[in-house]
């Protein structure tokens, strides 16, 4: 099987050359509706998204706070499993061949699917990377090897409590980008970000990692996005966007909410 194009590397290269930071929104596939997922993805790109993280709904999302847990439950109730997520990316790719798409989720659905079969299916659909929050880096070699064979990036997570030995491993094996969790806890839980502590860590990581470093968890608005982006290659915004989309009444409303939410963040990043 041929390797996938490296859209993630091309994206960060273009951003670096233009002096801009990556804006990476997270949405749960299948929420606020099955029909809204792909239109919302396109709306986010129009509003300035550089990469899209698409959450794979899971019944026990232990790393996620209440907002994304509820979103995942709603999506599962509509039948949004892994097969639906892959089909959504296929549909997205009919109009957008360049914006990277990264799946974020848990190991169980992929193991049920079969890791190699999943990797090949994902690449064929146009998926660029996968972030598995419950896959310890010490146990990731086999999965990484399968993904690497087909050109699928295994995105890694680092946090303020990550030990030095594990951090060395993450930095040396980073693919696509390294996702720095800016505080310890579940998604959406931070009322106020400690940007000074996060900035110190981000500078260290960028000096050590063999891939771009992005910051996420707790970024809620334009101000927090701009603050975190100073020492990162990009920022991820998830829970606040998921909350903004949650009760959209139809596809048109979901598209508008996505654009209205993301545009100020894009403007803040570009102004910084």
Curated annotation (Swiss-Prot):
Which GO molecular function entries does the Swiss-Prot or TrEMBL record give? tryptophan synthase activity
Do you know which InterPro entries this protein is assigned to? Aldolase_TIM (IPR013785), RibuloseP-bd_barrel (IPR011060), Trp_synthase_alpha_AS (IPR018204), Trp_synthase_suA (IPR002028)
Gene3D superfamilies given in the database record: Aldolase class I
GO CC terms: cytosol
Q: What is its EC number?
A: 4.2.1.20
Q: Which PANTHER family match?
A: TRYPTOPHAN SYNTHASE ALPHA CHAIN, CHLOROPLASTIC, TRYPTOPHAN SYNTHASE, ALPHA CHAIN
UniProt cross-references to CDD domains, sorted A to Z: Tryptophan_synthase_alpha
* Oligomer status and interactors: Tetramer of two alpha and two beta chains.
Q: Which residues form the active site?
A: 53 (proton acceptor), 64 (proton acceptor)
- Quote any Pfam family the record assigns: Trp_syntA
Q: Per its record, how is this protein called by name?
A: Tryptophan synthase alpha chain
Q: In which pathway does it act?
A: Amino-acid biosynthesis; L-tryptophan biosynthesis; L-tryptophan from chorismate: step 5/5
Listed A to Z, the keywords are:
Amino-acid biosynthesis, Aromatic amino acid biosynthesis, Lyase, Tryptophan biosynthesis
- Stated role: The alpha subunit is responsible for the aldol cleavage of indoleglycerol phosphate to indole and glyceraldehyde 3-phosphate.
Q: Which reactions are catalysed by this chain? A: (1S,2R)-1-C-(indol-3-yl)glycerol 3-phosphate + L-serine = D-glyceraldehyde 3-phosphate + L-tryptophan + H2O
Asked whether the UniProt record includes Lyase among its keywords, one would answer: yes
Q: Which organism is it from?
A: Xanthomonas campestris pv. campestris (strain ATCC 33913 / DSM 3586 / NCPPB 528 / LMG 568 / P 25)
Q: Which family does it belong to?
A: Belongs to the TrpA family.
Some GO term, biological process aspect, for this entry: which one?
Answer: L-tryptophan biosynthetic process
